[in-house]
Amino acid sequence: MSENQIKGILGTKLGMTQVFDEDNRVVPVTVVEAGPCVVTQIRTEEKDGYSAIQIAYGDIDPRKVNKPQSGHFAKAGVTPRRYVTEIRMDDVLSDYEVGQDVTVELFGDVKFVDVTGTTRGHGFAGAMKRHGFAGQGAAHGNQAAHRRVGGIGACATPGRVFKGTRMAGRMGNNRVTTQNLKLFKVDADSNLLLIKGAVPGIRGGLVTVKTAVKGGAHA
């Protein structure tokens, strides 16, 4: 496999802990149980217009899988899985085949990764919680507007509220990618990745771990 080839795997965020590095300094890490995944389909430039592998992850009761999905997994010769995603690549013909397992051993020489997950949903939140506004005065003439937004624009000019003005609204539950996180350790025996810092999502949430796009993946 090419050293610069994008590598990716699905996993579950287990939570955060702290470990010690070679200089005996405390390092906060997020533990991700990654894989094992299985390759269920290969996309090629000739047939699909782009190169990618489709990987599946997670156990699921076969009775909860519809017929098209069951047929897709059966064609690949694998048992049904809960999650399916595609990882774009430059060339997959020589590196992967349908039915092949994808494990954390793939990241043995990787130093930095990008992690994608779904952030915690907070529901409908006010401007102070959602955007960190300071709020208004607690007394001295303030009438029930302590946590309100305040001014949202002028009257005659422009005579409207600009699009994108920060207000109250639905907070969280967004797809977020955190880039260039240091991959602290790969535990192949337990299928664990120890990633320095925090990654998006709640404990038990699905995450996608890929080699860092903005360089430094193998530095």
Curated annotation (Swiss-Prot):
The keyword RNA-binding applies. InterPro entries: Ribosomal_uL3, Ribosomal_uL3_bac/org-type, Ribosomal_uL3_CS, Transl_B-barrel_sf. Keywords: Ribonucleoprotein, Ribosomal protein, RNA-binding, rRNA-binding. It comes from the Bacteria. Gene3D superfamilies: 3.30.160.810, Translation factors. GO terms for biological process: translation. GO terms for cellular component: cytosolic large ribosomal subunit. GO terms for molecular function: rRNA binding; structural constituent of ribosome. It holds the Pfam family Ribosomal_L3. The keyword RNA-binding applies. One of the primary rRNA binding proteins, it binds directly near the 3'-end of the 23S rRNA, where it nucleates assembly of the 50S subunit. Part of the 50S ribosomal subunit. Forms a cluster with proteins L14 and L19. PANTHER family: 50S RIBOSOMAL PROTEIN L3, LARGE RIBOSOMAL SUBUNIT PROTEIN UL3C. This is Large ribosomal subunit protein uL3.
